[in-house]
Amino acid sequence: MVALAITMLGAARAGAEEAPAAGPAPEAAAAPAPVTVAVATETAPITLAQAKPAAAPAPAATAVATPPPPVASPAPPPPPYSLPWQLRPVVAANVIRSDSTVAFYENAAGVSGSTVATMLLGSYKVTPYLAPLVRLGFVQNSAPGAAPDGTSFINPIVGATYARPVGPIRLAGFLAGTVPIGQGSTGTAMNSGAVGANSAGILARSGMDNAMYAVNYFTVIGGIAAAYVAHGFTAQVEATVLQLTRVRTSTGDSSRTNSTAGMHLGYFLIPQLSLGGELRYQRWLSDAAPVKANPVNRETVTLAIGPRAHFKLGKNWFRPGISYARGLDKPLTTASYNMVQVDLPFAF
């Protein structure tokens, strides 16, 4: 029995050794690991500069039209200038001007007569400051009493005006000469009425145009003028010297020296209307034959005043005016001179 028990114990031990060892008890199933995607690229080392965050992309450029350069404002127009009546303008201009004076007077017996003196001037600028000019004249006289009536084409004038503004001041110089071809020469067999018309024309024009009526003389004319023009106001003065040299006939003075001067004041009541007045003075600087004949002929003083309209026609100006003038001393007061001037300048 003992032997049988030993034999069975040995067999059991041998079977236990041949059987595989039992594994440990199974553990709870672990959660699945996250799936990763392997990138099969080689990553270069990252530098410090690359480690900075990338700059935001620049916004797309918007197409904007470049504005045109600013246009300069137009220059303000020059202040309005009151055009004088018989003084010379202190501007170089393109102008055609018809200027007529009707004078009424009496002779020593109190009989009335009249004179119409007409001037026509043309001027054209060759530079902004220089304007050559030509001036023509005609006079018609209805003499009082038994004196003969007459007409005369008087000496033309050829010359030039040089004018420049200096702030509100305008300066001008004038140089001209007469062409001694006028009618009424005392050395020719002309109608005596033309001689009388020339003498009457001098007084009708306040003695300011002596050179044109001195038909026997070649005259050199030189003058200067200055005007203050601002705020609708004009104040102008001028002075002129005339040197006359006889070139026709053998009688009379071989030479004479005359002078004229004047002052003009004007004001614009509205842009289309101005009022102007001027004082005019003429004096013989030499003892010319008229002075020797009667000392009161040495000088004349007149005063004129009147309105002038100003009409802009496109780029042109029409400035018609009318003035009344009266003599302030002899011989004009002796003959009771009253003068009306109609002035029609057209600037283009």
Please describe what each predicted stretch is.
Residues E17-D99, F104, A109, T161, ...:
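Outer-membrane beta-barrel biogenesis signature
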Residues K125-A131, V139, P165-I169, V229-F233, ...:
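Outer-membrane beta-barrel channels and translocator barrels
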Residues R97, T101, A108, T245-F348:
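Outer membrane beta-barrel transmembrane domains
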Residues A147-R256, K312:
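Outer-membrane pore/translocation modules
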Residues V90-M119, F138-D149:
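Surface-exposed strand-loop-strand hairpins of Gram-negative outer-membrane beta-barrel proteins
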Residues A103-N107, A131, R135, V139-A143, ...:
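Structural signature of outer-membrane beta-barrel domains
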Residues S112-T118, G150-P156, I169, A214-V220, ...:
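Residues that define the transmembrane beta-barrel architecture of outer-membrane proteins
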Residues P89-S100, P128-V134, V158, L171-L175, ...:
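Transmembrane beta-strands of outer-membrane beta-barrel proteins
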